Amino acid sequence: MAIEKYFIPDFVELQRRSFQRFLETGLIEELNKRNPITNSQKDLEILLYPEYYKLAPPRWNSLDAILLSKTYSCRLYVPAQLTNRKTKQIMFKWVQLGDIPLMSKRGHFVVNGAARVIINQIVRGPGLYFSEIQYNVDSSKKTLVRRYAAEFISMRGTWLRLSIDKEKMIWAELKKTPKIPLVWFLLGMGLTEKILFQSLTQPKRLLYNYLDYLKIDNLAIDVKSQNDAFAKRALLRELLLKSKLNSSNIKTLKNSKDFKPLLLVNDIYSEMHSYKEKENRRYPLNSQNGDLADEKEKIPYYANSSLKALELIYSKITNTKKITNLNKKFFAKQGQKWIFKKFMNPRTYDLGLHGRLSLNKKLSLSLPLSQRTLTMYDVLVATEHLLRVEQGLLGTDDIDNLKNRRVRTSSDLIQMQIGIGLLRLEKNIRSKFTTIKGVPKINYFFSTKPLNGALKEFFGTNPLSQFMDMINPLAEMTHKRRLTTLGPGGVSRDTATMDIRGIHPTHYGRICPVETPEGKNAGLVNALTTFARVNPEGLIETPFYKVYKGQVQKKAGFFYLSAEKEEKAIIAAGDLNLSKTGFLPKGLIPVRKFDEFTKVLRNYVDFMSVSPLQMISVATSLVPFLEHDDANRALMGANMQRQAVPLVRSEQAIVGTGIETRIASDSGHVIRAKAGGLVGYVSGQKIRIYTFVSNF
Amino acid sequence: MSTSQSLNIIPIEYSLQTYQRSNQDTSMLHRPVVKEGEWVQAGDLLSDCASSIGGEFSIGQNILIAYLPWEGYNYEDAILISERLVYDDLYTSIHIERYDISTEKNPYGIEKITKDIVLLKDTTELNHLDKNGIAQLGAWLKEGDILVGKITPTESKKEVARYVQLYNDILGKKINYAIRDSSLRVPRGLEAKVIRVKTFPERKNETKNWENKIGLKSKALAFSVQHFLSKNQSNKKRTLSLKSKWEKETSLSSFSSLAWQKKSPLFFVFKNGIFEKLKNFPKKKKKNERVFALKKKSSKKFRFFELQKKFRFFFRNFFFFKAPKKKSPLFFFFKSETFDKERNFQKMSPNQSKQNWVKISIKKEWQKVGSFGKKKASKGKISFFPSFPQASLVGKASFFSPSRFEKKRDASNFLKSSCISSVHIYLAEKRKVQVGDKMAGRHGNKGIISQILPRQDMPYLPDGTPIDMALNPLGVPSRMNVGQIYECLLGLAGKHLGEQYRIQPFDEAFGPEASRSFVFSKLYSAKTKTGQSWLFQPTNPGKLKLFDGRTGNCFDQAITTGYSYMIKLVHLVDEKIHCLTVDHEVLTTKGWIPLNKVKTSHFVATLKKNGQLVYQNPTNIYHYPEFKGELYHIKNVNLDLLVTLNHRMYVKNGIIEATSSVDYQLIPAKDIVGQHKKYCKTAFWDKENYQFILPSVISNSIVIPEKTMNMEAWLQFFGIWIAEGWALTNTISNNNVTNFNQSSSSPYVVQISIKKKKVLEILNNVIPILGYSFNYYDNNITICDKQLWAYLRPLSLGNPYRKLPIWVWDLSQDQARVLLLAMITVFKNGTNSKWEKAASLSSRLSLASVFPEFLKKRIDKGLSYYTSSVELADDISRLALHAGWSGNNYLLKKKGSISSFDGKQIICQFDIWRISIIQSKNQPAVNHGYHSKGKEEVLPYQGAVYCLSVPNEIFYVRRNGLSVWTGNSRSSGPYSLITQQPLKGRSKHGGQRLGEMEVWAIEAYGAAFTLLELLTIKSDDVTGRLTIWDYVLYKKPLYIGTPASFKVLICELQALCLDIGIYKADKSNILKQINVSSMG
C-alpha cells in the first residue's frame, strides 16, 4: 500500500523512451518512406530493408567523446538491394547511410565533445481547428465583428486556413501567398461545381465573394435591355442580393417551384460568365490589363470549372494579371502543380497518423488512415463545418487546451531531420542514376554525406538542440524534462500572446504551473510535472486513482489520462485524508470537473489525484513548505536551485521534501550497483564488486 | 538447484569520474560511499556525485540565519555573511576550465609547441613545463604563467644550398630563425591547478598539407636516406643530426627516428618504400599492390570478424619483411581504420601512396589503439589480435591514465614531442565565497553578499553561537514567501534534535495549520529535550533574543533565527562584455584611430538620437585582453563588423523604408543573427555655414589684407586644387612664363593640372569669381598670386602626404558636399562615362523620370576619389560623413603592384586608395535575401576585445574601410556597490534613491513621518546649509530664510481660508507682508 504512495516515475524516462521509440520504429518508418528509389526509366531500383538495419558499436563511449571532442554516435548500416531490370540482376549489399548520434543513458547526446539536450517541443497537434477572430469595424474599438476561421494544421507542410474576413468573404489562406477565394480553391482541389454546390447546405454563402462583382450597375441596365430571359435573371440577382439582408425573400423563392436553390445559383453564375465574356468583347484593352476586375482587388473572377480555377489561382499567386488563350493551359497546369505540391504530395505534405485521425473524427469522415495528405473532401466538409460555426451551430476550438497540443519529443525531431537527410540522399541517388555508365554497384549510389549533413545541421543549429545545462544534476534533469513552445513550427516569443503563456485547466498534473523562466520566455518554456508522461501520440498524460463508489482503488494502479479523457471526469484532489479502507471522507468533497470547482458526494467522484506532487515539476517539488510561498517566489526558488554550484562540501538539507534521493539517482550522476555483491576494492578511480552468478 | 560449485564470482568494475568538467565549468566527480568488505544489493548507492550526499541531492549548507537589518548592509536584499563561511570552505566550489591551443601555419612556417623558447631561456617561466612545453600535471599556476609554450616563426627560412644544409646537420649546427613567443598563458585573475592535459598529435585537415610537403621534399628525403643507408649505421652522431634535420623538414621525423632503431617492423616497411622509390623494384611492388588490393576489399566489410581474417592474411604478408620481436606499441599502427584511407590511395601514385599510407597510419591511429583495445578487452569478445597478447595488455590500461603514456614513452617520445599540434589543458580553480556572489534559499529569497564580517562581530544566540548570515527582514512580508520562515524554524529544531525532516508540500490533509503546528511542536520538543529553554519562548514563538556581537548588548526585539538551507548560485558575468575586435577604427576629431589607441581625451564621432553627428569624449574605455567566446561577424559591400555577441548594433527593421533615424534601435548582435536589418552609415551634420578668409601676407613690404572668399567658388576651386594642384616658386623665369605677360613678374605660382574638360569649365567660372586671373597652358592652369600661394604652399605636399586643412571640419553639410563634389569632379569623367552615356540616353528618350532609381545607382557607383595618401583617404571619408553621406575606403592597388596603362607597365610606388562616396544608399541591409553577397557568421574567438562608452551611446566605427554606426559598450550605467544591480533610473548624479523594499518600510513607518522629515529636517538642513555656505563664500550678508515646513504650514492654513501671512519688519518697524511664493 505505502509503496504506491511513493511511486514516482523515472525522471529522464521521457528522453530515453523517446529515443528507444525512435530506434525501434521511427528510424524504420522514415527509411520506409523513401522505399523504393527508382530511376526515370524504372529499370533500376534501389530497395532498402530498414527492418534489418544494424548499428555498429560507437567508437567512443559518451565520456571519451566529451574528452576527445568527438560525437557519440554509431554507424547505421542497412541492407540494400539493387535491381537491374535491364540485365535482370539483383545485387545485395550492406550500405552505410551515416552516423546516428546516440543518446546516452542519462538522456543527452554528445556532439563534438559537448553534451547537448534536445528539448521537447509543444506544438499544435495536426488536425483541424476552428477559431473565432474579432475585428474592429471602426477605430474606436467599440464594435467588434466576430468572424471565424478553420485551420488545417499539418505535421509537415503548409498550414491551410479557411477564413471569413470582415466583409464576410470566404478565403483560403496560406502563409506567404495571397489569399485565394475558397471556391477557386475547392474547384482547384478537384471538385466539380455540381458536387460542390450540392453538398453544401448553404451554397450561396460561398458565392458571397462575387456579389459585389454583380453590383456593377450598368450590368443590370444592360441585361434588362437585352431580352426577357436576361431580365428575369437580373431580377433573380437582385433578389439574391437582397437576400443577404432578408432571408424571407429567398424562402419565398425557394417555395415557388421554379426556383430551386441550385438552379438559382446556376443561373447566377452562368449569367456572370456571359457578362464577362461580353465585357471582354467590349473592353478588350481593359480586360487585358485586368484593370476592371482589379479595381477592387477583392473582387475576383468567377471560376466555373477546375481548369479555370487553377488558371486563376496560378495567376493570383504569381501576381500575373494576364491570362491569354495562349498561356491558359500552362497556367492551369502550373496551378495544379502548385496545389499538388502544397497539399497532395506525400513528400511535402504530411498530416501524420494523428492528424488524419483527428480530421476524420472532427469531420465525421471515414478516409483511410493511410491517406496522410489533404483531400478535397476534407476541405469541402471543413467548409461546411466552418459555415455552421459561423451560424453558431458548432463551437470553436480552444487551441490552448492540451488535447489540441502535442509534444514533439527528441525522437520526433531527430526522425524529421533524418527524413530530410534521406530525402537528400534520394535526390543524390536519383541524380546518380542519370549519370551511371555500365553496370553500377550499390556502393556507388550511397554516401554518408546527406544524412550526416542533415543531422549535423540539426544538432548544431536547431534552437531545440541546446547546450546542456550541467551546473548541477537538477539543472541537467529539468533541462531534459523541459517543454517549449518556441522553435521551428512553434510560436515566436515576440508574437506570443498572454493566452499561450497562461495556465490552462488542462495543465493540471501535466505542466507545472510554477516553473517557467522569468522574462520574455515566461510561459512559453515549461516543465513537465513529476508524474506526467508523454504517450506515443505525443499527448501528456497524468495518473489518477480510480474511485469506485467512494472507495479509492489504489491497488488497481494508475490510470493515465490525457487532457481529452480527463475532460468529463470528476476528480478529487490528492491531499484528501482517506479512511483505512480507502474511502473518501463523507460529506461534500471539493472536486474539479474540467475548469470548474464544485463539491460533490464521494459516490460521484470518478478519479482521485495520485499525489500533491502530481501537479508540480521536479524542481518545484524540492521547495519545502511550497504551499506557504507566493507563486512568483516559488518560481524563483525552483529556478535558482538549478543554478546552484556544487560545493566542495555540501550538506543534506535538514528540511527537505523527500524527492532529493530520486533526483540524485535519476539524474544518473550517482553510481548504483548493477548487481548485488561484495565490495572488493574502493578507490577514487574505481569500485570493484564481486558478484556471484550461478551457472545454469 | 545450483550447487556452490556452479557459482561463479565475477568482478564488476565501476570507474569513477574524477574532476570532470561540465558544460558550465562546474566540476563533476564521484565520491565512493561504500567500504571494502561491505555487501551491496543491486540498486544500492556506491558513489555520490559532486552534488549529492548519501544519495540525496544536496547543493547547499544548513546555516544559521537571522532576519535582522545590520548597519544597512541588507539594503535591497543584500546578504551579510560571517567569515566562517569563507574559512571553513562551506561555500567553496571547484570550477574546471579547459584551455585549448593549437599550432597554425603562417607565411613563415608552422608554429611549434615546445619548451625551447629562446626568449625565455634565462627566466624561471619555463620551469614548470615538461619537456614538450606543456605545464606539468599538478602544477599550481597563477595569472600570466605559461600553460603551453609555443613559438611562432616570424621570418621566412632562408633557402640554403643542400650541401650546406647537410653539412649543418652533420655538425649539429642549428640555425636560429626569428621566432615569437606565442605561448598560452593563464588568463587574468585565475589561480588554478593543472589537472588534466590532453595532447593531439594530428589534425585531420593537415593531411593534405602533408601530402604536398612530401611531394615537394621527397627528393631531399630520398637523398638523405640514401646517404644514410650507404653509411655505417652505428654512426650515431650522424643519424641524430640527420634526425634533427628531418624534424625541421617534415614531421615524419618520428618515423625516421624510429627507423634507426631497426627493431620495429615499420622500419622495413619504410625502407621498402624508399627502395622502391629509388630503384623501383618490380617484384616488391607487385606484392605491395596485392596488399593494397586486399585492403580495398576488406574496408568495405564492417564485420569485425571478417576484418580480422583479412588482417591475419595481411600480416602474413608483412611478416615477409619482418615480424616483431619485441613488444612495440607501434605495431598497432596497422589497424582497421587505416584502410578507410583507401580512397586516398587510389588517387595517389603507388610511390606516394606508400609513404602516405605509412604516415597516415602513424598520425591517425596511434592514439586510438588504446581505446580500441580497451573496448574489445572489456567486452570479453575475441581479441582483435589474438596472436599478439600485448593487444589486450595495452587495451587494459586506461587510455587516459598517465601511466599508459609512461609505458609508451620510450617508443612514442619523439612522436609526441614533434607531432603535437593541439593541446587541451584543464585547470581546476577553487572559488571561495566572496562579496558580490549571489546566494539564495529555496523560496526565491536571493541576494548578493554585501559584506563578510568577522565571526566575533556577528550577532550571537543566547548560547553564544554566532549567526552565519543576516537576511533582510523586509524580504519576507511583501514577497509572501513565508515558507522560508517555516523552514528556518524547523531547521533550528532539527539541528538541536539531530533530526532531518522530509515534508511533502500540501500537508493540509493532516489538518488546518498543519505546517505551523508541526514546526512549533518540533521546536517545543527541542526545547524540552535539550533543556535549552531559549529555543522556544511562548511569548515570541519562533523568535530568539539575539546579542550584538560588537557590543554584547541584547537587541531590542526578539529576532527570527534558525537554520536554513542556502545555496550559492553561478554568476553570469559574460553579459557585461560588449565589444569589438582591435581591427576596428574609430572616427575622432583627430582622424581614424584604432580602437585600442582611443583615449578619453579624444573627441569621438557620436550620433544623437535624432541622427545628428556630434563629437564627444568617451566616458570610459574598456579593454578585455583575454576574451574567450564567440564573435559575430557581418560583412557586406558596405559594412564590416566583428563584435561580441552582446555588442549592440544600431539597426532597424529591414522592411522599413523611411530614412528617418527614429526607427533605429540598439539591439544585441546575437538577437539579429539571420534577420533582415538595416544599418546606418550617415548622419546629419548640423553646422552653420563657414566663411573662409584667406590670411593676409606681406608682399614686397606691402601688407595684402585678408580676403573673404566667396565660399561656393572657393570650395570648388580648393577642391580641385587639392586633388590636382600644387603651388611652387618659380624662381627662374622660364620661357613658358614669360609668354604670359600678366604673371611673368610673379614667382609665386599656383597651378592645377587639367585632365578633364569639365574641370576646366568649372575653373573658368570659379576663378574669376574669386578675383584671380589665370593662364591655361599645356593642360595646366596657372594663377600667380602671392597671397593664395602663401596659403596653399604648405598644403602643397607630395601626393602620398596630402591632407585636408582643419577648417574643412567647420564646413556646413552643404559646403562639405560642394567641396567633396569638387574634389571628385577631377575623377568623374573617366569613371563615369557609362553613367553619362546612360544619362544622356535617358534624357534623349525623356525617360529620366521613369528610371530615377536606376540613375541614382549609377551615381553611387560613380562617385569615387582616388589617392595615394592614407591621410587624405581618411579625411575624405570623414568629409563624406560631414556631407551627410558616407565613404568606403578600399585599397585599390597595393604598393608595388603593376598595372599597365597605355601599354606601359606602371609600378605603384604607393598604396592607392579608392574612396567611394555613397550618397543615397546609406542604409545597407543585411539578410534581405536578394542576393547573398554578404557574409554573416558566428565565430569562436580568443583574444583581446575593446570598446568605449560615449554619452550618446552610438559611435562611428570602421573595419577594412567600411564605416558604420554602432552601439557603445555599456549603457546600464553605474552599478550599486552593495547589490551589484544596475542603478538605471534609481541614480542621479551618483546618488541613490531608496530601494524598493525601503519604500515599503517607509510606508509601514508612516508616510506622515516621512513627509515631516523631508519637509522639516531634510529640506531645511540641506538648503539652509547650502545657502549659508553660499553667503559665506561670496561674502554676502547673512540671511536666514523661512523653513520650508513653515511655508507649507502657511499655505495649508491659507487654504483653510484663514487670513494668515508672514510679515517682515522694516527698518522703520513697519510690518510688510511677504508673498509666500517669493519667500527666500
From Swiss-Prot, chain A:
Q: Which domain of life is it from?
A: Eukaryota
Stored Pfam families: RNA_pol_Rpb2_2, RNA_pol_Rpb2_3, RNA_pol_Rpb2_45
A single GO cellular-component term on record = chloroplast
The catalytic activity of this protein is classed by the Enzyme Commission as 2.7.7.6
Which reactions fall under this protein's catalytic activity? RNA(n) + a ribonucleoside 5'-triphosphate = RNA(n+1) + diphosphate
UniProt entry keywords in alphabetical sequence: Chloroplast, DNA-directed RNA polymerase, Nucleotidyltransferase, Plastid, Transcription, Transferase
- Can you tell me which residues the record assigns to a coiled coil? none
* Enzyme class of the recorded protein, top EC level: transferase
Cell location: Plastid, Chloroplast
Check the record and name the SUPFAM superfamilies matching this protein.
Answer: beta and beta-prime subunits of DNA dependent RNA-polymerase (SSF64484)
User: Which InterPro entries does this UniProt record tie to the protein?
Assistant: DNA-dir_RNA_pol_bsu_ext_1_sf, DNA-dir_RNA_pol_bsu_external_1, DNA-dir_RNA_pol_su2, RNA_pol_Rpb2_2, RNA_pol_Rpb2_2_sf, RNA_pol_Rpb2_3
Among the GO biological process terms of this entry, one is: DNA-templated transcription
Q: Which GO terms describe its molecular function?
A: DNA binding; DNA-directed RNA polymerase activity; ribonucleoside binding
Relate the assembly described in the record: In plastids the minimal PEP RNA polymerase catalytic core is composed of four subunits: alpha, beta, beta', and beta''. When a (nuclear-encoded) sigma factor is associated with the core the holoenzyme is formed, which can initiate transcription.
Q: According to its UniProt entry, what is the function of this protein?
A: DNA-dependent RNA polymerase catalyzes the transcription of DNA into RNA using the four ribonucleoside triphosphates as substrates.
Q: Which family does it belong to?
A: Belongs to the RNA polymerase beta chain family.
Anything else the record notes? In S.helveticum the gene for this protein is split in two.
Q: What is this protein called?
A: DNA-directed RNA polymerase subunit beta N-terminal section
What gene is this protein a product of?
rpoB1
UniProtKB/Swiss-Prot annotation, chain B:
Keywords noted in UniProt: Chloroplast, DNA-directed RNA polymerase, Nucleotidyltransferase, Plastid, Transcription, Transferase
One Pfam family matching this protein: RNA_pol_Rpb2_6
**InterPro entries linked to this entry:** DNA-dir_RNA_pol_su2 (IPR015712), DNA-dir_RNAP_su2_dom (IPR007120), DNA-dir_RNAP_su2_hyb_sf (IPR037033), Hint_dom_sf (IPR036844), Homing_endonucl (IPR027434), RNA_pol_bsu_CS (IPR007121), RNA_pol_Rpb2_7 (IPR007641), RNA_pol_RPB2_OB-fold (IPR014724)
Q: Which GO terms describe its molecular function?
A: DNA binding; DNA-directed RNA polymerase activity; ribonucleoside binding
Compartment(s): Plastid, Chloroplast
What cellular-component terms does GO give this entry?
chloroplast; DNA-directed RNA polymerase complex; mitochondrion
**Main subcellular location:** plastid
Query: Is-annotated flag, keyword Metal-binding?
Result: no
The protein's matches in SUPFAM superfamilies, at most eight in alphabetical order, are given as: beta and beta-prime subunits of DNA dependent RNA-polymerase (SSF64484), Hedgehog/intein (Hint) domain (SSF51294)
Catalytic reactions of this protein = RNA(n) + a ribonucleoside 5'-triphosphate = RNA(n+1) + diphosphate
An example GO biological process term is:
DNA-templated transcription
Q: Which residues form the signal peptide?
A: none
Instruction: Give any extra note attached to this record.
Output: In S.helveticum the gene for this protein is split in two.
Recorded hits in PANTHER family, A to Z, give: DNA-DIRECTED RNA POLYMERASE I SUBUNIT 2
The function of this protein is:
DNA-dependent RNA polymerase catalyzes the transcription of DNA into RNA using the four ribonucleoside triphosphates as substrates.
- Family affiliation: Belongs to the RNA polymerase beta chain family.
What subunit structure does UniProt give? In plastids the minimal PEP RNA polymerase catalytic core is composed of four subunits: alpha, beta, beta', and beta''. When a (nuclear-encoded) sigma factor is associated with the core the holoenzyme is formed, which can initiate transcription.
Tell me what this protein is called.
Answer: DNA-directed RNA polymerase subunit beta C-terminal section
Annotated organism of origin: Stigeoclonium helveticum
